[in-house]
Amino acid sequence: MKFAVIVFPGSNCDVDMFHAIKDELGEEVDYVWHDTENLDEYDAILLPGGFSYGDYLRCGAISRFANAMKAVQKAAEQGKPILGVCNGFQILVESGLLPGALMRNENLKFMCRTVQLRVENNETMFTSQYEKNEIINIPIAHGEGNYYCDEETLKQLEENNQIAFRYVENPNGSVSDIAGIVNEKGNVLGMMPHPERAVDELLGGAEGLKVFQSILKQWRETYVVNA
């Protein structure tokens, strides 16, 4: 399986993503600059955290216009796994690939610590290696991670089982404690916590690795077992 890590000006978690795939998952991965127009050779696309374009205007508001995002849109339509973490989640929302918005944290402070998440849906291509309602420890590092959507959108997210992760103790004011959501098709996941920072016990924990293992499992079952 071959992954692409999209690198925007200001990305700073791209190396962590690369490490998670190459060294922990053991799969092929490339850094791909934001001006690329073709992602056809890749099986999964990763949008890392950071401060793309300095977070000017709004987090992800400029990145959404990058050439690479047109290719990401195409990949999403093809059903390829798309994972956006932190700033990557913000970019997915700004691009319209996921509903809602990310606002300033309720306490108006940047937060960097490990939090507990509850796995709400383990039937997605990103969460199949977890147990439903499993509690996992994943780091956060954001100033604008307060997820917001209107009541109608929240109702749709809940009815469609699109809420992948919830905070056990809400750190930022996100509506309904939401930490991560998938699109209706189930192949695009956006989450504020950083699973790529929790893939090695030496770094404090490896409970985020199952996100990437789930992607790999789904791909193998689809393209290898059925080959």
Curated annotation (Swiss-Prot):
GO terms for cellular component: cytoplasm. PANTHER family: PHOSPHORIBOSYLFORMYLGLYCINAMIDINE SYNTHASE SUBUNIT PURQ. PROSITE patterns: GATASE_TYPE_1 (PS51273). InterPro entries: Class_I_gatase-like, PRibForGlyAmidine_synth_PurQ. The keyword Kinase does not apply. Pfam families: GATase_5. Residues 3-225 form the Glutamine amidotransferase type-1 domain. It catalyses: N(2)-formyl-N(1)-(5-phospho-beta-D-ribosyl)glycinamide + L-glutamine + ATP + H2O = 2-formamido-N(1)-(5-O-phospho-beta-D-ribosyl)acetamidine + L-glutamate + ADP + phosphate + H(+); L-glutamine + H2O = L-glutamate + NH4(+). Part of the phosphoribosylformylglycinamidine synthase complex involved in the purines biosynthetic pathway. Catalyzes the ATP-dependent conversion of formylglycinamide ribonucleotide (FGAR) and glutamine to yield formylglycinamidine ribonucleotide (FGAM) and glutamate. The FGAM synthase complex is composed of three subunits. PurQ produces an ammonia molecule by converting glutamine to glutamate. PurL transfers the ammonia molecule to FGAR to form FGAM in an ATP-dependent manner. GO terms for biological process: 'de novo' IMP biosynthetic process. It comes from Bacillus cereus (strain G9842). This is Phosphoribosylformylglycinamidine synthase subunit PurQ. Part of the FGAM synthase complex composed of 1 PurL, 1 PurQ and 2 PurS subunits. Its EC number is 6.3.5.3, 3.5.1.2. It is found in: Cytoplasm. Gene3D superfamilies: 3.40.50.880. Keywords: ATP-binding, Cytoplasm, Glutamine amidotransferase, Hydrolase, Ligase, Nucleotide-binding, Purine biosynthesis. The keyword Hydrolase applies. Disulfide bonds: none annotated. Its main location: cytoplasm. One of its GO terms (molecular function) is phosphoribosylformylglycinamidine synthase activity. The active site is at C86, H194, E196. Pathway: Purine metabolism; IMP biosynthesis via de novo pathway; 5-amino-1-(5-phospho-D-ribosyl)imidazole from N(2)-formyl-N(1)-(5-phospho-D-ribosyl)glycinamide: step 1/2.
